[in-house]
Amino acid sequence: MRHYEVMIILDPSQDERTVAPSLDKFLEIVRKENGTVEKVDIWGKRRLAYPIAKKEEGIYAVVNLTCESATVLELDRVLNLNDSVMRTKVLRGDK
């Protein structure tokens, strides 16, 4: 198993109180495949460096997790299919 860091930018029209429960629903994929979620850090609404889908802001969340590579690929696929997710970036950690 490898360590990964996933950055997720969510639609700013979403209520910030619903971010944690919706992320938890996505992270259930990792838990089902015997992976672990070490940390979920929700940064809140931030200004984007450039517009994405004509939006100037996004809700940032960073997730540190440990899982197999196939699991993180499936998580990225499911996140990209969701309309409330504007952008994702998966980085392999150095743990």
UniProtKB/Swiss-Prot annotation:
<dbReference type="GO" id="GO:0070181">
    <property type="term" value="F:small ribosomal subunit rRNA binding"/>
</dbReference>
<keyword id="KW-0694">RNA-binding</keyword>
<dbReference type="InterPro" id="IPR035980">
    <property type="entry name" value="Ribosomal_bS6_sf"/>
</dbReference>
<keyword id="KW-0699">rRNA-binding</keyword>
<dbReference type="GO" id="GO:0005840">
    <property type="term" value="C:ribosome"/>
</dbReference>
<comment type="function">
    <text>Binds together with bS18 to 16S ribosomal RNA.</text>
</comment>
<protein>
    <recommendedName>
        <fullName>Small ribosomal subunit protein bS6</fullName>
    </recommendedName>
</protein>
<comment type="similarity">
    <text>Belongs to the bacterial ribosomal protein bS6 family.</text>
</comment>
<dbReference type="Pfam" id="PF01250">
    <property type="entry name" value="Ribosomal_S6"/>
</dbReference>
<dbReference type="InterPro" id="IPR020814">
    <property type="entry name" value="Ribosomal_S6_plastid/chlpt"/>
</dbReference>
<dbReference type="InterPro" id="IPR014717">
    <property type="entry name" value="Transl_elong_EF1B/ribsomal_bS6"/>
</dbReference>
<keyword id="KW-0687">Ribonucleoprotein</keyword>
<dbReference type="GO" id="GO:0005737">
    <property type="term" value="C:cytoplasm"/>
</dbReference>
<dbReference type="GO" id="GO:0006412">
    <property type="term" value="P:translation"/>
</dbReference>
<dbReference type="InterPro" id="IPR000529">
    <property type="entry name" value="Ribosomal_bS6"/>
</dbReference>
<dbReference type="GO" id="GO:1990904">
    <property type="term" value="C:ribonucleoprotein complex"/>
</dbReference>
<keyword id="KW-0689">Ribosomal protein</keyword>
<dbReference type="GO" id="GO:0003735">
    <property type="term" value="F:structural constituent of ribosome"/>
</dbReference>
<dbReference type="InterPro" id="IPR020815">
    <property type="entry name" value="Ribosomal_bS6_CS"/>
</dbReference>
